[in-house]
Regions:
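Short, small-residue-biased leader/transition segments that mark boundaries at the very start
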Residues: 1-4
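Short amphipathic
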Residues: 13-28
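Hydrophobic core residues within well-ordered beta-strands of beta-rich domains
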Residues: 20, 86, 102-104, 118-120, ...
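Acidic-glycine-rich active-site phosphate/pyrophosphate-binding loop
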Residues: 36-48, 133
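Hydrophobic beta-strand-centered segment that forms part of the acyl-chain substrate-binding groove
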Residues: 53-61, 67-105
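Conserved positions in beta-strands of structured domains
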Residues: 93, 107-109, 125, 138-140
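Short, conserved beta-turn/loop elements at beta-strand boundaries and strand-helix junctions
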Residues: 111-115
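Surface-exposed, gly/pro-biased binding rims or lids
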Residues: 130-145
Length: 145
């Protein structure tokens, strides 16, 4: 669910199958701001007229903008505060257009309690359920009880 525990979870409070999500509607301003931060002004992202002429049929979000919401889930919800992002693999499977509502979800699929390492399935979907980013992350849950 969308349970946010800002103080974070200790490894002993977590279990395989636990998951959390974050949703946001992607605005043109989000894409322009992200382009400004990272310096990627590819016209498919920032020029709506040009983007209409591409295979995407319109302006799309940067893949890394879409994927960055995985970090929101991990840092704000599960495991939350004191989480250390160790590793992430990503597969970009479909575009995100201006106005799409994305939902990033992370689910614990394995735990190394001794080393406080979580293996998490990470997925981002849009409003119709289409998977736009698929991946897996390794996170260290360093919060102490």
């Amino acid at each position: 669910g969308d349970v946010y525990k800002r103080q974070g979870y200790a490894i002993s409070e977590l279990s395989v199958g636990q998951k959390a999500s974050f949703s946001k509607t992607i605005l043109g301003a989000d894409i322009y701001n992200f382009a400004g931060i990272i310096g990627d002004f590819n016209p498919v992202h920032v020029n709506a007229e040009y983007a209409k002429t591409t295979r995407f049929g319109g302006q799309i979000a940067h893949g890394m903008l879409t994927a960055s919401f995985i970090s929101t889930v991990l840092g704000m919800a599960l495991p939350g505060a004191d989480a250390i992002f160790l590793e992430q693999n990503l597969k970009f499977t479909a575009p995100v257009h201006v106005g799409d509502t994305i939902t990033a979800t992370a689910e614990i699929i394995d735990m190394d309690v001794k080393h406080k390492i979580l293996t998490m399935k990470t997925v981002v979907t849009i409003q119709d359920g289409t998977v736009v980013v698929d991946g897996q992350a390794k996170i260290m849950a360093t919060k102490k009880l």
